[in-house]
């Protein structure tokens, strides 16, 4: 549990500056999006961070790569740089691929509402059962978000003399630890 709590998603040594992102999809109103962002702002505050800015976009459907459009991603990047934001938090559920793509382009952590809620639970779990349940939920959330490391330092692909092949990659090791 301590390892999971230590790896909570929002840094607490200082109050992070967060940019909130909301997308108004077809069938919803701008007011719905603003209400969702107001609630998300309270969640972020509870998690120990400060809302620094908000960005919204209207879309018929989410972008497969980023959830928001490429132009809005560039605008988000500029806002993050201008206000020195640490993290962006989406009110909408991000796929692991969207989260990865956003983090790669923005150069900072991208989270969704679920991650913030899990972070709050991790901070406030006190009983053994509660801690175990939070850890399990966090591991289930993180499992599909594991990525193969691009750096050679993350690979453990050396098979030794007399072994039957290459060793585990970091991704395989992480996946095995979670499962």
What residue spans do the PLM features occupy?
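Extended, highly charged alpha-helical segments
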Residues: 116-179
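N-terminal accessory targeting/assembly segments
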Residues: 1-113, 117
């Amino acid at each position: 549990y301590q390892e999971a709590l230590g790896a909570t998603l929002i840094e607490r040594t200082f109050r992070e500056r967060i940019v909130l992102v909301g997308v108004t999809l077809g069938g919803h109103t701008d007011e719905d999006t603003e209400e969702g962002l107001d609630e998300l702002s309270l969640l972020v505050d509870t998690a120990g961070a400060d809302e620094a800015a908000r960005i919204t976009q209207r879309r018929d459907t989410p972008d497969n790569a980023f959830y928001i459009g490429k132009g809005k991603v560039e605008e988000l990047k500029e806002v993050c740089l201008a206000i020195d934001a640490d993290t962006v938090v989406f009110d909408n559920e991000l796929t692991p691929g969207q989260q990865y793509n956003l983090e790669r382009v923005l150069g900072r952590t991208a989270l969704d509402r679920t991650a913030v809620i899990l972070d709050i639970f991790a901070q406030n779990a006190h009983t053994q059962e509660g801690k175990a349940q939070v850890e399990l939920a966090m591991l289930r959330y993180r499992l599909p978000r594991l990525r193969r490391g691009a750096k050679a330092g993350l690979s453990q692909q050396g098979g030794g003399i007399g072994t039957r092949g290459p060793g585990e990659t970091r991704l395989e090791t992480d996946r095995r630890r979670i499962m």
